[in-house]
A protein has these predicted regions:
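Residue immediately C-terminal to the conserved phosphorylatable aspartate in receiver
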Residues: 10
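Asp-based, Mg2+/Mn2+-dependent phosphohydrolase catalytic module
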Residues: 1-6, 17-19, 39-43, 91-94, ...
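Short, flexible/disordered intra-domain loops and linkers
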Residues: 18-24, 61-68, 216-221
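Surface-exposed cleft-lining segments at the edges of enzyme active sites
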Residues: 99-108
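Basic, amphipathic juxtamembrane/active-site segments
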Residues: 21-33
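A metal-dependent, Asp-based hydrolase signature
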Residues: 30, 46-99
Length: 254
């Protein structure tokens, strides 16, 4: 077994999701703010959130992070305080963020065969890790609702660390915290830039999945780099689609 540790992206790799952060969602979130005396229109709340997030990202980028990640709930809490609502602002920020996520989510589901595939890979001796550009304030609950948490040996979410893929420091968080041998790790993700280029820069082998959530400007999987077709010893492979039962069997051949 060439690899002992499999590192997964979440959305677009294990989980199929569609969100619509449209005007109606902002209006509903603004209504929640108004319940507590923080009065915004939907458009004003969206503008204030975007401006506050950009300011925080700029400050983080100027200090040390190439790809900063700001917890959304902190920004929501700031917007409550901007309207003079200081009591329990942090808790209100959490609630507002979760409300926004729920209101904007049209569907959230595992790709077919994910749980079975993870169980099969675990039975073959692999350790399974999650490394996701995600917000703990809602992703932790989504993992629980989908039954994914119990299948994983460890979870790293970018909002906990202030940086996100493709920043090599985020990959190193997992390597260092868990004592992993980077030469025995395979990163599996659906984004050539954040997942694949970032992992390669950090020294991991990579498996690119071209799924329905891969950015539309990114190429489909190259058949010449498919598992079984790529040259022996190759540390990058590509896979078209999200058939996890089939993919688990292929991974086991590496």
């Amino acid at each position: 077994m060439t690899y002992t540790d499999l590192v997964f992206d979440l959305y677009g790799t294990l989980v199929d999701i569609h969100t619509e952060e449209n005007d109606a969602v902002w209006e509903k979130t603004a209504l929640y703010f108004g319940y507590y005396g923080a009065h915004y229109t939907g458009a004003a709340l969206k503008e204030a959130f975007t401006r506050a997030m950009a300011a925080r990202e700029a400050r983080a980028g100027q200090s040390y992070e190439c790809f900063p990640d700001i917890p959304f709930e902190q920004v929501m809490a700031e917007l409550f305080r901007d309207k003079g609502v200081t009591e329990k602002a942090d808790a209100l920020g959490v609630n507002a963020t979760q409300l926004f996520r729920i209101a904007s989510t049209e569907y959230l589901r595992l790709y077919p065969g994910v749980l079975e595939a993870l169980a099969e890979l675990r039975s073959r001796g692999y350790r399974l890790w999650l490394l996701s550009n995600a917000q703990r304030v809602f992703t932790a609950y989504e993992l629980r609702s989908l039954g994914l948490g119990r299948q994983l040996d460890g979870i790293c979410l970018s909002s906990d660390y202030g940086c996100r893929k493709p920043d090599v420091r985020f990959f190193r968080v997992l390597m260092e915290e868990r004592g992993l041998d980077v030469s025995r790790c395979l990163m599996i993700g659906n984004d050539r830039e954040t997942d694949i280029a970032g992992a390669q820069a950090a020294g991991l082998a990579t498996l690119y999945m071209h799924t329905n959530l891969t950015p539309p400007d990114q190429a489909a999987a190259d058949p010449a780099l498919a598992i079984g077709a790529a040259p022996a010893g190759n540390r990058h492979h590509e896979y078209e689609g999200s058939d996890w039962i089939r993919l688990a069997g292929l991974i086991s051949t590496l």
